[in-house]
Amino acid sequence: MNFLKKSLFLVLFLGFVSISFCDEEKRQDDDEGNEREEKKEIQEDGNQEERRDKPPAWVPGK
């Protein structure tokens, strides 16, 4: 019976450690994804400002 308790404790402990590592990696991946999205938004905002600064193109017939 004591052997079964130790085995069960070991399995649960290793499972907990495994889940902890997975959660940590997931958080890191999410952080990297958020940084990429922020960079894209900054670039898009910069492109919109450049478009506002340029006069509209000349269109013949107007």
UniProtKB/Swiss-Prot annotation:
Keyword set, alphabetical order: Amidation, Amphibian defense peptide, Hydroxylation, Secreted, Signal
Origin superkingdom: Eukaryota
GO cellular component: extracellular region
Sites of Proline amide modification: 60
Endpoints of the signal sequence: 1-22
One GO biological process term: defense response
Residue ranges of the propeptide: 23-53
Sequence ranges of Basic and acidic residues compositional bias: 36-55
Stretch list, region Disordered: 25-62
Functional summary from the UniProt entry: Myoactive. Has selective relaxing activity on vascular smooth muscle.
Protein name: Tryptophyllin-1
Organism from which the protein derives: Agalychnis dacnicolor (Giant Mexican leaf frog)
